[in-house]
Amino acid sequence: MSKFSKNLKPITFPTHNIGKSLLSLYDVGSMSGLTEVLFMERCLRLLKKGGRMGMVLPEGVLNTSNLQKIREYFEGKAKIILICSIPQDVFIAAGATVKPSLVFFKRFTEEEELQYLGAKTRAEKEIRQKYIGQIKALQEKIVEEKSKKLKVKALIAAAEKELRDLEKAIIEEAKPLTKEYFHYEIPIAMVEDAGITSTGAVSAGNQLPTLQDEYKEYRIAKKLWNEANSAVSYTINSQGRLFRTSDGKEVELKW
């Protein structure tokens, strides 16, 4: 044991998140506590810019109305490069009964981040022009009420609330326009046989290899990304801090 003790070092775990709610560590934590949603954000954060990932997700994440804000969050961070619906049979043997989909993301590159921000800014500016008269009228009303000696707090509060509501409405109305200005194709596929039966046995007509070949041709033709030969590694130091090394560059991954 003595020869090993020289190499053993105590690990100091980070304490900056102790006592905090788990959900508070996530951007989406205020919108949803679903584990699959939190997992999506965590995986996306671990990716380097331009990095890709694939996940198995319940189809509800893609189409349920109460997760709309979640979808908008990820649409502002990454491109969806493929959605593939797979049979419910695939995970029945494991006890899962939810209809699944394979979803593949590519985190924005720095250039795409700027493009998305530009599209969002342009859309919001354009929509704001439609309401500029109302905005100015409310702002003037607030200034006028605050300048009076006998200030009516209820009137000021009502005008400020109306202005906040109008700002929220502008942001919501601009979202479809942002998608229009930041437009890209999202290929969608459906396979009836994913290689596994409802009993967990291997099926004979697996369509996924064919889809893989077809998608490879598609992504090369569309120049979705270039093949990279650089190695990516992850390490945790003695203080419990997580680092990613890629192309010889080390970056600390933080919450």
Question: Model regions: which residues?
Answer:
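A conserved structural/catalytic subdomain of Rossmann-like adenosyl-cofactor enzymes
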Residues: 1-255
